[in-house]
């Protein structure tokens, strides 16, 4: 990987971490440790590896991602927002009763989420069928 690409990925991951911390702080609820620990992996997947199109999030030929530790939604939601699936401003609705950014990833309300998860360990079994 060229140096400029790596630098850009690091900057994106740092921005996503800041957004995740703000989300958890503003909601006074969430799982910051688990969310921050996977940010580099999510950044590389969504910005360098996976074939996804924010303009066509249900493309049948897209790569799919299952966030098995669904309680770490403060990691996935900022990545999806920065990738263009929805506006960054939507993150302000995290864990609000009138919003769609739940504490566990939710596929029915958030474009780019391929599976609703929450119970630890359910994601891997569902992902492989």
Predicted feature locations:
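N-terminal hydrophobic or amphipathic helices/low-complexity stretches enriched
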Residues: 1-16
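A broad, low-specificity signal for short, low-complexity segments enriched in glycine/proline
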Residues: 2-4, 28-29, 88-91
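Cofactor-binding active-site loop characterized by glycine-rich and histidine/acidic residues
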Residues: 9, 20-23, 35-128
């Amino acid at each position: 990987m060229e140096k400029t690409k790596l630098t850009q990925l690091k900057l994106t991951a740092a921005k996503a971490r800041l957004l995740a911390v703000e989300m958890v702080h503003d909601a006074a609820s969430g799982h910051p440790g688990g969310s921050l620990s996977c940010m580099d992996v999510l950044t590389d997947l969504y910005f360098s590896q996976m074939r996804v199109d924010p303009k066509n999030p249900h493309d049948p030929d897209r790569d799919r991602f299952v966030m098995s530790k669904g309680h770490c939604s403060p990691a996935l939601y900022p990545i999806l927002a920065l990738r263009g699936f929805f506006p960054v401003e939507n993150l302000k609705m995290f864990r609000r009763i009138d919003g769609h950014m739940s504490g566990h990833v939710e596929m029915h309300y958030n474009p780019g989420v391929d599976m609703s998860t929450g119970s630890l360990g359910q994601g891997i079994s569902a992902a492989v069928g």
